[in-house]
């Protein structure tokens, strides 16, 4: 799987370098994003449903603004910097292959065009107890978990529960949200630190009751 990804990434980079060398940058947009998504496919899947074994979340249907922002965070080292964050480090390396102008917004546009998948829950938690804890989350992410672009709060509804739990732990443990340039990550970190392990499990269980509407 890893070798397959490197082969795909190398091919995408080679095509981009050739185009740049000829003075013809690829045209940004959905078609370009679909081609670039070949680099994402081995981990996130053709439909963007993710792969827990690889630490790859469901990304299908995420808003383009959020995908772009996180790709730029990985590219700049604001994510994937913790030495034991294997999935984050891998993602940071992948983001570096999107090095031509227009690459990031193009792949973000394609990801946003994919139909949300609403992965099935795999973790245990008390959703009723988590509803009370989610009140603090709803201030930014909304009561429906749909997110808020104005304050850079991503949608939570429809995301894999294991990924949400993993990100809360990363914020709590300083694997994410400690870079001074990651303003919105720094905003999130204190909220994660306020939750103990049971609280995280319960909030995540409640979020699983909020589902993305099909397109």
Q: Predicted segments — roles?
A:
Residues 1-11:
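Bacterial N-terminal signal peptides that target proteins for export
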Residues 52-58, 74-104, 120-125, 150-155, ...:
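Axial heme c-ligation environment in periplasmic c-type cytochrome domains
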Residues 30, 35-76:
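The feature marks the first
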Residues 23-26, 49, 58-60, 109-121, ...:
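His/Cys-centered metal/cofactor-coordination and adjacent catalytic loops
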Residues 64, 68-76, 104-108, 112, ...:
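An amphipathic alpha-helix signature
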Residues 19-21:
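C-terminal motif of bacterial Sec signal peptides marking the signal peptidase cleavage site
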Residues 37-40, 56, 64, 88, ...:
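Disulfide-stabilized extracellular ectodomain repeats and their linkers
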Residues 25-47, 122-146, 215:
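Sequence/structural segment immediately N-terminal to covalent heme-attachment motifs in c-type
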